Amino acid sequence: MGYKVAVVGATGNVGREMLGILDERKFPADEVVALASRRSVGVDVSYGDRTLKVKALEHYDFSDVDICLMSAGGAVSKEWSPKIGVAGAVVIDNSSAWRMDPDVPLIVPEVNADAAAGFTKKNIIANPNCSTAQLVVALKPLHDKATIKRVVVSTYQSVSGAGKDAMDELFSQTKAVYTNDELINKKFPKRIAFNVIPHIDVFMEDGYTKEEWKMMAETKKILDPKIKLSATCVRVPVFVGHSEAVNIEFENPISADEARNILRNAPGCLVIDKQEPGGYVTPYEAAGEDATYISRIREDATVENGLVLWCVSDNLRKGAALNAIQIAECLINRKLLTAKKKAA
């Protein structure tokens, strides 16, 4: 018996990606339903070679839904995820609404799949922040080998992480530069075309942004609360793909060659690390791919037991949609979820 899957936020960047990945991976779904707000009702979205008509979230009966992939933002998730969970569906939420709730597992399957069993408290599982997901995939195998003490990470995050309007703004501003038209800032506080913005999400009292706080708090919850981490998150004029420069200090010695070999055999990682021009991965190559790509692995001579690396991933896939579907697959493979009997 297959599963009934509802995708909430099906008209957004991540929702559309979820529908595509469900089809690509041949997820065992007998039925897939596309849901969104009332203003999107009737919109067509693609699910493989099929077209789904978007239905209204507000009027949908979730009693026979097995899995709800929620990608409609934090406010919608706060209101609807508990109701959907009570109706008996497992909600896998892509927003930040539930990530730090102690009764909600925060899961990256390559890193902490065992924690997924805790979903039964609220029938909700949280998907991490896009920049966190690729970071912990790269850190986990190294942490297992040499125990990480401290991480300093600088991110180079694409505009798709801020939604379709942000992608449109980058496109229109880039075009405006060449046509000598006025550049209009709506989504970003400063122009994004041919620029970088060291500010993602709101500022916190300590001077960090909320995006930076998410990376620090989520990495501790997923990987190890003892790890010290500092993040600087930067928006760059790239459409898809997040990049990170990561400096790691370990408790125990680990060489660059050891790290390279460990990461080559780690789930979700793909090492492309040649010390030559072009022997590394950029966000352009990572777009549309599932892996977390790791390059520029080298020892840091300024700190004992230090390494530096570069990691890149498609933020709409591993950073969001793919990770959510991998969580659903994890529940099924571990027999933590069985399909409801549907009315004939």
Identify the role of each PLM range.
Residues 39, 240-243, 288:
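A short, glycine/Asx- and small/polar-enriched loop/turn
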Residues 123-134, 207-216, 221, 319-323:
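A glycine-rich, Thr/Ser-enriched phosphate-binding loop motif common to dinucleotide/cofactor-binding enzymes
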Residues 253-287:
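Terminal hydrophobic/aromatic helix or amphipathic segment near a protein terminus
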